[in-house]
């Protein structure tokens, strides 16, 4: 059953709102995926903060017109699932990780920072660590000297206690 005009306008408005805040859109073809697998993909997307939806391509074309993602319109053919995220790598990572384990989901294209990406570009974007992962690594690097210094002070204090007890 098709959507009536009001429903179509609502979908375009919803997608436009998501695209307005987005940094990345990743697109994949999803022919023949089992419902359970698609439900698992949606759950993973929700955890990662990715807006994931199967949409009519014409409605998405309207939603991305006059946005930095407008160049993606030529790639929107066939049955597609759209991942839209504010995190630069989250949408690409969710779809790419799922595609590795399910050959019925095929990455097709994406867009990041106004540039249209092909399948290889989306895979490259997905391989970049997320912001949270990079911050965790930075924090670990910054804490290493402090924890090493604290460990040295504790060892020195223990050594002095042992010398004081022996004397």
UniProtKB/Swiss-Prot annotation:
Part of the ribosomal stalk of the 50S ribosomal subunit. The N-terminus interacts with L11 and the large rRNA to form the base of the stalk. The C-terminus forms an elongated spine to which L12 dimers bind in a sequential fashion forming a multimeric L10(L12)X complex. Keywords: Ribonucleoprotein, Ribosomal protein, RNA-binding, rRNA-binding. It comes from Azoarcus sp. (strain BH72). One of its GO terms (cellular component) is ribosome. This is Large ribosomal subunit protein uL10. It holds the Pfam family Ribosomal_L10. Forms part of the ribosomal stalk, playing a central role in the interaction of the ribosome with GTP-bound translation factors. Belongs to the universal ribosomal protein uL10 family. One of its GO terms (biological process) is translation. CDD domains: Ribosomal_L10. It comes from the Bacteria. GO terms for molecular function: large ribosomal subunit rRNA binding. The keyword Ribonucleoprotein applies.
């Amino acid at each position: 059953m098709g959507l009536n005009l009001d429903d179509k306008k609502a979908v375009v408005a919803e997608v436009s709102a998501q695209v307005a805040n987005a940094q990345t859109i990743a697109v994949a073809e999803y022919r023949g995926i089992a419902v359970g697998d698609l439900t698992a993909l949606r759950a993973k997307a929700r955890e990662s903060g990715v807006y994931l939806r199967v949409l009519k391509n014409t409605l998405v074309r309207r939603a991305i017109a006059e946005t930095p993602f407008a160049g993606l319109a030529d790639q929107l053919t066939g049955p597609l699932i759209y991942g839209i995220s504010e995190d630069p790598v989250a949408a690409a990572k969710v779809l790419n990780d799922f595609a590795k384990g399910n050959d019925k989901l095929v990455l097709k294209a994406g867009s990041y920072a106004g540039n249209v990406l092909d399948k290889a570009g989306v895979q490259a974007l997905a391989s970049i660590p997320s912001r949270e992962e990079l911050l965790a690594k930075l924090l670990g690097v910054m804490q290493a000297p402090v924890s090493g210094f604290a460990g040295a002070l504790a060892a020195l204090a223990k050594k002095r206690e042992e010398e004081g007890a022996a004397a």
